[in-house]
Amino acid sequence: SGGAVASAAVGGANLVMTACYINTLPYELIIQESVKSVEDLKGKSVGISRVGSASDVAARVLMKGLGLEPVRDVPILQVGGPTERAAAFRTGRIIGFPSPPGTIHLAKGMPHRVMISTADFKKRYEFPYICSTTTKTYLASHRETMRRLTMALVEATHFLKTRKEDTKKFIAKYTRQDNPQYLEDSYAANVKLHDRVPLVTREGTEVQIKEALARKPGATLRVEDIVDDSIVRELEKSGFIDKVYK
């Protein structure tokens, strides 16, 4: 994600995002059924994988969407991946956790409800989430390879948007899940979230840069240091993307 790229770049990594296929955070806040109001969340912990991760950003954004101040009103705990978060949720160590749409359908025997989703926001929360990332050196020396990769992923996005049943089979295969509701929700979310033209969100990248710089005083980083989506712009200008979608 853009947050990880920004953090790595602040630390000296020579990375650049060349395209972003999802430019927002596809997360919902899963909470215990006992939580009936926003007030019930205060003082109770929400679980994430690790600080700086997409789940961390999502937790903070969702808290603010509820009018709460992350950490101050609702502590954020690093508890690990999906399995660890589910275990912490079952035992009551955490009152909730951010989750991609549909994933909760895989958690059998866990009484829960969705309190808020980024899909509920009136304005899309800009965040470079699923992006093609490489080093500046590789992009300069293998630009044609990166161009062909981008073309293939634009075509794959079109396949996703137009071949529902086939796409659900791929989701089932690579997630190793066959829960019908999960597959349906996952597909519906992905169709909505994937951008037709995969430009990298400048607004979202700027926010992630500010977050990364706040963790490393004295460092400097600009959007243009970690974003080069010129290949996408070339493909759009050439008519390639329009041709794919005809």
Model-predicted segments: where are they?
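Pocket-flanking alpha-helical
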Residues: 1-16, 26-39, 55-62, 83-88, ...
